[in-house]
Amino acid sequence: MKQHTYIAIDLKSFYASVECRERGLDPLDTNLVVADESRTDKTICLAVTPSLKSYGISGRGRLFEVKQRVKEANAGRQHDAPGHRLDGTSHFFSELQANPSLAIDFIIAPPRMAYYMEYSTRIYQVYLKYIAPEDIVVYSIDEVFMDVTDYLNTYKLSAHDLAMKIILDVLETTGITATAGIGTNLFLCKVAMDIVAKHIPADKNGVRIAELDEMKFRHELWSHQPLTDFWRVGRGIAKKLEQNGMFTMGDVALCSERNEDLLYKLFGKNAELLIDHAWGWEPTTIEAIKAYRPSSNSLSSGQELHCPYEPQKAKLVVREMTDLLVLDLVDKGLVTDQMVLTVGYDIENLTDPARRVKYHGAVETDHYGRQIPKQAHGSINLDGHTSSTRKIMCAVSELFDRIVDKNLLVRRMYVVANHVLPEADAPKKNDGAVQLDLFTDYAAEEEKQKAEDAALERERKIQAATLAIKKKYGKNAILKAMNLEEGATAKDRNAQIGGHKA
């Protein structure tokens, strides 16, 4: 079997680096955080520059956490400064290192998602100068995998040299630096990038490149902690492993030899992936990823509200989300036969004594370890595959009324169109045999069906016209009355990409 060589490239603090470059600043020497300050200090930071991270700031923390950590760091600087005084501020790391009397400052840059996507496209064009698109998988806006097996001989370069050549081209073209991982499979190149590269010194351009094969992985990372540093090991998986005495990938590998059944009992068929990764194995290739076609598909929309909503106001937002989701179905030529709704409740339902005494239902723990009411979840089947706004909106409204506790404040909602498929592939309602009887007026039924078909055709034309207007003049060029009601969010979200300012 041919030995493959893969490269993973991650653009360093991508959003923050773009914002620095657009300001004519060095991303490696500037304290900058990308966050929408207009959403209050609880907003999530989308990116933090490396210099700001050096003060112990997380790359995905909340803005108030960044401010608090900088405040603490400045308190330490003041204690160590001459005369215990800080005189002036700077957001440049080099200036702060040279002058201990300066206070740490940082720039808060509002996100510009559309602009980051443009930058990402330009960088992808650089990748295409070296690697064919069929050998590249775009993992995210700032991360790619490449199968460079057949390119090393062509360029007469090692994998390390090829990775460096590509990264330096990106740096010269855009001013953005990167980290790379090289491995004999996709898992190893990802882990080399995520874990090993972080612990090696960067070169003068801020570039880090690390390499792993199976034996090196076992030698260097079988004792690494925490487990959540590894690709595809989330907090839930790590917690289960730790509860069963496994704290490292070496522990998982040992368990797979001595008690493999335990892993399958804990994780079902997903144990196979975990065991493979514990040994540094990964059989999936980029070619297989490109050829993969899922057996079933869905479209979804999720949203976390800026403040808790009463159920009726939350229902308005769910209806807005459903309306836009249906338009997305129509635009893609898809239909669905099932809608799924998940509604998460706010922590205030349990922290407010007046509300707490009224709630007697199940309680669960969120990611922050806080107690919240158990989320509502349900599904509703439609009368066949459809992309009718009227039918789907009625179904989701009915589902909301059925599953949501009317006494609880809502914080987040997810709407999913399940079993979606191309409209041309959808089974027709009258494909099967029909049982006739003497008591049904089939002429009236036929007229009723004709009227329904005509209504659906009118609705389809309205949907098509709406899409055409939105595409030409913008998503907010045409709005419904509900989008202007108090608490509606669609108008603001139409100006966003991925929930952040475009």
Where is each model-derived feature located?
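DNA-contacting surface of Y-family translesion DNA polymerases
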Residues: 8, 103, 229, 239-410
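Short, well-ordered secondary-structure micro-motifs
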Residues: 191-192, 351-354, 425-428
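Short clusters of hydrophobic/aromatic residues that line enzyme substrate/ligand-binding pockets
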Residues: 209-212, 227, 299, 380, ...
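Gly/Gly-Pro- and Ser/Thr-rich, intrinsically disordered tail segments characteristic of DNA damage-repair
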Residues: 1-276, 282-286, 445-502
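Residues at beta-strand starts and edge strands
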Residues: 3-5, 176, 337, 409-411, ...
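Residues at or immediately flanking beta-strands
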Residues: 177-179, 340, 414
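Short, charged/polar surface micro-motifs in flexible loops or helix N-caps
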Residues: 12-14, 38-42, 345-350, 420-424
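Acidic, metal-coordinating catalytic segment for phosphate/diphosphate chemistry
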Residues: 18, 369-502
